Each structure stands twice: as C-alpha cells, then as structure tokens.
C-alpha cells in the first residue's frame, strides 16, 4: 500500500513508484476484465481509486457502498491544498481543496501513545496526497485518511488528474452496457480561483506549463471585472491560505510570460486574454 518512505508501494501503472500498481494489480482496472463471479467476490479494499473532490461529493451511497455511476469505490486518493487544519487529542481534521468543488473534510486519526510523523499537522497552504476511505455521516461525506503525504513536485498534481481520467474511463468501459453511453461522469468542472476551465478541454492551464498556484492566480485575475484590474492586496485576501511570497512569485512569472500585465500601477493586473 504505502512504503516506509511515505509513498505508494507501486504507484499508478507502476511507474517510478515500484511495481504492482493500480493498473497492474490483480483484478485491477488494468487487468483483463473479470467474470461476473470474480466481480462479486472481489473486495473493494483491493482498489485504490484516484478521484476528485467533486466526484466524491457527488457519489451515491447504497447501504455502506459508494458508487460513481456503476463503479464501486471505497479506498480513494485525492490531491489538493490544505485550507484548514485543526488538531484534537485523537485526530486531525483537514479541509483539502483540489479546486473542483468545495474543500472536503479529511480526518486522520492519530496514535496518542506515540510521537510519530503521523501525529504532525500539515500546515495550511501545503499540497498533499491523501489516501483513505470515503465515509458519510449525517449526509456529509468525508475521507478517513490512512495516509497523508506532502506533495513537493507539482507534476504530481497534474499526474493525479490524468490518473482520475484514466481510472474512471476504464471503470466506465467495464461497467457500461454495450452500446451504451457514459456510465461515469467525470464531473470535474474546475474551480481554480472560483472560475471555470481548470481541468476541461483545451483551456487546461496545467497543460500550458503552469503550476496549480499559477493557474489559480491567473484564473482569479481573469475573472476580475474591474477596469483597473485586480489589486495584489485583493489577491492576498482571496488566497489567504497561500504564502505571500508564493503569490508574488506566481504574479511575476505570469507577467514575465505574458499571461497578465500591470495597469494603473505595478500592483494591479489584468489578463492578456481580455476575458
């Protein structure tokens, strides 16, 4: 599942993270299609399904089973930024935002008898990869995490979104009736900076060489309607969970690359797209 270094024992497709990963595990989505009997006997716990927060929030529940379309899921992974962290004696509650929907509650139980790394609180503003079980209590969904690992390389954010697309397309092709339409809607409208187009079609900023931070800031500036453009102070207010230096570096990069330009002064910016 997870190795001693905090990563997957066999990542998606077994590429660079060890062998026997998501695409190659027995009965996994990269294996030959199992028979109906095998499908029924296979435990959901053998599958770790890459998802977006939007998909998890829209998943349907029948008894203790969650589904996206016809696909069962129990163990899931999400990648996002920590917006809030609150530590209690027995657990840590995070709000993790992958910018496809409202931030999702992620609860990690801690060992009260040991001062292990699992008991350390990940600070807000950090990107993390969460692996855990989808749960619902009083009609509110959350993830109970068995592992939360920091994401240092933003390529992992983009890689996760590609894993999401591949996993749910594969589940769709296995679960959809022959000749039928799509059984699993990806439902990833994108909410980078509360504006659309984050992960859909050709407007995906991640494919244009931008990091998630840069994409979020660019979309905020695009969505601002004032004639003078968005002020840097307004950016800081909107991105209160993000480090000021990170915001400044992203703004400088976007300006140098021609995505935005300054207007009335060096602290107001508009998008060169003219949206």
Swiss-Prot record:
Function summary: As part of the heterotrimeric replication protein A complex (RPA/RP-A), binds and stabilizes single-stranded DNA intermediates, that form during DNA replication or upon DNA stress. It prevents their reannealing and in parallel, recruits and activates different proteins and complexes involved in DNA metabolism. Thereby, it plays an essential role both in DNA replication and the cellular response to DNA damage.
Location of the protein in the cell: Nucleus; Nucleus, PML body
GO MF, any single term: single-stranded DNA binding
Quaternary structure annotation from Swiss-Prot or TrEMBL: Component of the replication protein A complex (RPA/RP-A), a heterotrimeric complex composed of RPA1, RPA2 and RPA3.
Residue ranges of the annotated DNA-binding region, renumbered to this chain: 76-150
Protein name (Swiss-Prot/TrEMBL): Replication protein A 32 kDa subunit
SUPFAM superfamilies given in the database record: Nucleic acid-binding proteins (SSF50249), Winged helix' DNA-binding domain (SSF46785)
Cellular component GO terms, alphabetical: chromatin; DNA replication factor A complex; nucleus; PML body
Family annotation (CDD domains): RPA2_DBD_D
Annotated keywords: DNA damage, DNA recombination, DNA repair, DNA replication, DNA-binding, Nucleus, Phosphoprotein
One Pfam family from the record: RPA_C
Record organism: Xenopus tropicalis (Western clawed frog)
Primary location group: nucleus
GO biological process: base-excision repair; DNA replication; DNA replication checkpoint signaling; double-strand break repair via homologous recombination; mismatch repair; nucleotide-excision repair; protein localization to chromosome; regulation of DNA damage checkpoint
Transmembrane segments: none
Family per similarity comment: Belongs to the replication factor A protein 2 family.
Region (Disordered): 23-47
Modified how: Differentially phosphorylated throughout the cell cycle, becoming phosphorylated at the G1-S transition and dephosphorylated in late mitosis. Phosphorylation increases upon replication fork stalling.
């Amino acid at each position: 599942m997870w190795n001693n270094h905090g990563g997957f024992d066999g990542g998606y497709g077994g590429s660079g993270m060890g062998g026997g990963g998501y695409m190659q595990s027995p009965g996994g989505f990269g294996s030959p299609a199992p028979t109906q009997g095998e499908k029924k006997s296979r435990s959901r716990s053998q599958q770790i399904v890459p998802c977006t927060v939007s998909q998890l929030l829209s998943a349907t529940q029948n008894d203790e089973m969650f589904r996206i379309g016809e696909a069962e899921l129990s163990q899931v992974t999400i990648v996002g930024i920590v917006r809030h962290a609150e530590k209690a004696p027995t657990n840590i509650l995070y709000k993790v935002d992958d910018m496809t929907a409202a931030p999702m509650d992620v609860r990690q139980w801690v060992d009260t008898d040991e001062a292990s790394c699992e008991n350390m609180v990940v600070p807000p503003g950090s990107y993390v990869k969460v692996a855990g079980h989808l749960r619902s209590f009083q009609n509110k969904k959350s993830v109970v995490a068995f592992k939360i690992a920091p994401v240092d390389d933003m390529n992992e954010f983009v890689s996760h979104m590609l894993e999401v697309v591949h996993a749910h397309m594969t589940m769709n092709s296995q679960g959809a009736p022959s000749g039928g339409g799509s059984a699993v809607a990806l439902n990833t409208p994108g909410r980078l900076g509360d504006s659309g187009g984050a992960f859909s079609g050709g407007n995906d900023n991640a494919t244009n060489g931008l990091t998630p931070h840069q994409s979020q800031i660019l979309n905020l500036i695009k969505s601002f309607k004032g004639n003078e453009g968005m002020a840097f102070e307004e950016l800081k207010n909107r991105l209160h969970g993000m480090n000021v230096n990170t915001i400044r570096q992203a703004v400088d990069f976007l300006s140098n690359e021609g995505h935005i330009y300054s207007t009335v002064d060096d602290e107001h910016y508009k998008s060169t797209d003219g949206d």
